[in-house]
A protein has these predicted regions:
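Short glycine/acidic-rich loop motifs that flank beta-strands on beta-rich extracellular proteins
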Residues: 58-59, 91-100, 121-127, 138, ...
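Extracellular beta-strand-rich solenoid/capping regions of secreted or surface-exposed proteins
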Residues: 33-42, 55-80, 90-113, 122-147, ...
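Leucine-rich solenoid repeat scaffolds
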Residues: 549-585
């Protein structure tokens, strides 16, 4: 009696019935391919490979120009391959620069689940010609296919990539709707997983380990999302990729690299190496735990970017909710239009966040702190060769330097900055420093320096900040440019000189400064070698029995000193100054 369509779908074809032998000695390539071809020809959908070790010729039936293409087990469309948990597909040792254990090319509706697929990298003969890297030996090669699922498979020891997902066929035919779930992929010489020409790929719940170890070949990434273009022509482009809830460890270089993909989401992963948005566009890196392996020296950055792609106008990267610890630099931001928010960065050496050759950068609501006393070093935020950077609502603690900027159009607003040696240092470019709570609070690792300093050729607006528990200048300016110091609250100064400004032109307006120092000498505002500055409407209080020097400008020229309220203090001005309307109590 003829089988009905539902019965046909339920039929499971046993590969051993076609001569496949799981003894680890017999070449079963032809037998498994014959089984797959017969299954498809009969309208069945499922092939079963039982427990055993099946030897496969990964170069069989290959394209001489690309020996991985069409090679090994060639999987037709509308087929599901089920393997026992103890099944092993083992590639025979060879000397080819390319091969494949499973090839899925130009077909649709394929599923491979269970078992192990093992390469021959340790038995391989690495001939010097024609391609000496031998980086094209693949566990599963997917080219121009669609609706493919790889699940619960262990893949290891390939000369190239464990899995590669790319375009194929005539013209440009990307692979579409590919899922790799709950797999273990390890010890590939090149990348454990490469994603090149595709649209809609999901990698979820996998363990990705030890890519590029030993005699590995570049780039040695856990997961590499990388297309290819020349000039204005794009030959391969990865788009709509999700890398979610995976564990990545021991990969020689990046754990995950989006070199130039578009619309990539990297979320919920646990990694001991770098996650990179590269030159990619519209990358989201969210809610990952990235903790450096202390035994690894090759990867020094938790999350990084490389810049804007040659054919793109912006990066449009979002970095949010990640926990990053133990790296030299926590986050290295490059490119244009990057938003970093809600990240926790711990135990870095050089910089918590670095913005380098970056523009339109928003860094908000992050917690940057060194917890271990011997690692309380480095800079929480470093801005170099960058512009249009906003740093707001962040918390910084236990660092040598809180913020160092040489950028232009920098906004440093509403941050809480505590326990540091040097606070905010603007040494080039221009910045607005507004609404911050700044308290060195007895930082122990190195001596305390300035809370806010503006030096060299920089200019700054320092407005509505609160300074407390400091032992060195809360504000120090030695720039030749213009600064505005407006509406700040400087509490209980213990210093001989509280505000020290030399050279340049300064507007010191509406600040409140209280002196906590019990004895003389004391100067609250000292303006030195400046000209055409203004000291207006400030409130200056001393708690000493004797009057202190509230304002000293006798080594500057043409200063306006107007409308200040001075409690237990006096003004020492220069003969060229205008002194008017001040109240001395």
């Amino acid at each position: 009696m003829q089988q009905q369509p539902e019965e046909m779908r339920m039929t499971v074809v046993d590969a051993t019935k076609f001569g496949a032998v799981g003894d680890g000695k017999t070449d079963s390539t032809n037998a498994i391919n014959e089984c797959l071809a017969w299954t498809k020809s009969m309208g069945y959908n499922t092939v079963w490979i039982p427990n055993g070790t099946y030897l496969i010729d990964g170069t069989k039936n290959s394209d001489p120009r690309a020996p991985f293409r069409g090679a090994g087990i060639n999987v037709p469309g509308n087929i599901e391959i089920l393997m026992d948990a103890e099944t092993v597909i083992k590639v025979k040792p060879n000397s080819s620069w390319g091969y494949a254990a499973f090839y899925i090319g130009g077909t649709s509706n394929v599923k491979i689940s269970g078992g192990s697929i093992i390469g021959e990298r340790d038995e391989h003969t690495y001939t010097p010609a024609p391609r000496p890297t031998h980086e094209w030996g693949f566990g599963i090669c997917i080219e121009g296919a669609s609706n493919v699922v790889i699940e619960h498979v262990r893949i290891a020891d390939f000369t190239g990539d464990g899995i590669i997902i790319s375009n194929g066929g005539d013209g440009y035919k990307p692979s579409k709707r590919i899922k790799v779930t709950d797999c273990e992929i390890r010890r590939s010489r090149r990348n454990n997983l490469s994603i090149t020409g595709c649209d809609n790929v999901l990698v979820e719940g996998c363990e990705i380990a030890d890519a590029g170890t030993g005699n590995g070949t570049a780039p040695r990434f856990g997961i590499d999302i990388e297309g290819y273009s020349e000039g204005n022509i794009v030959y391969e482009e990865p788009v709509n990729v999700i890398i979610r809830n995976n564990v990545l460890k021991g990969n020689v270089n990046n754990a995950i690299s989006n070199f130039n993909g578009t619309s990539v989401i990297i979320e919920g992963n646990i990694a001991d190496g770098t996650i990179s948005y590269g030159y990619g566009t519209s990358t989201t890196i969210a809610n990952n735990i990235i903790k450096k392996n202390p035994e690894s020296t090759g990867q020094s950055i938790g999350i990084n970017g490389l810049g804007v792609g040659a054919l793109e106008a912006r990066s449009d990267a979002v970095i949010k909710g990640n926990l990053i610890s133990g790296f030299t630099t926590g986050i290295d931001i490059r490119g244009k239009s990057v938003f970093a928010t809600g990240n926790q960065i711990r135990d870095f050496v050089n910089a918590g966040i670095l913005a380098y050759q970056a523009s339109q950068i928003f860094i908000e609501g992050n917690n940057i702190e060194n917890d271990v006393p011997e690692q309380r070093s480095g800079t929480a935020l470093s801005i170099t060769q960058s512009d249009n950077v906003t740093f707001s609502g962040n918390q910084i603690a236990n660092v040598v330097l809180a913020v160092r900027s040489t950028g232009n159009d920098v906004q440093i607003k509403d941050n809480v900055i505590k326990q540091f040696s040097r606070g905010i240092w603007i040494s080039q470019g221009n910045a607005v420093i507004e609404g911050n709570f700044i308290s060195p609070a007895g930082f122990q690792t190195v001596p305390e320096s300035y809370a806010v300093s503006v030096t060299n050729t920089a200019s700054a607006v320092i407005r509505k900040n609160t300074f407390t528990r400091f032992r060195n200048f809360p504000i120090y300016c030695s720039t030749n440019e213009h600064t505005k110091i407006i509406g700040n609250d400087i509490e209980d100064s213990p210093l001989i000189v509280t505000l020290y400004l030399t050279r340049g032109t300064h507007e010191i307006i509406g600040n409140t400064i209280t002196l906590g120092r019990p004895s003389l000498p004391a100067i609250l505002i000292y303006l030195d070698q400046s000209s055409n500055s203004a000291i207006l409407d400030n409130t200056l209080r001393s708690n000493t029995a004797a009057r202190v020097t509230a304002i000293q400008t006798n080594t500057s020229r043409q200063t306006l000193i107007i409308g200040n309220t001075v409690v237990k203090g006096m003004i020492h001005s220069h003969e060229t100054d205008t002194v008017h309307g001040n109240i001395e109590v």
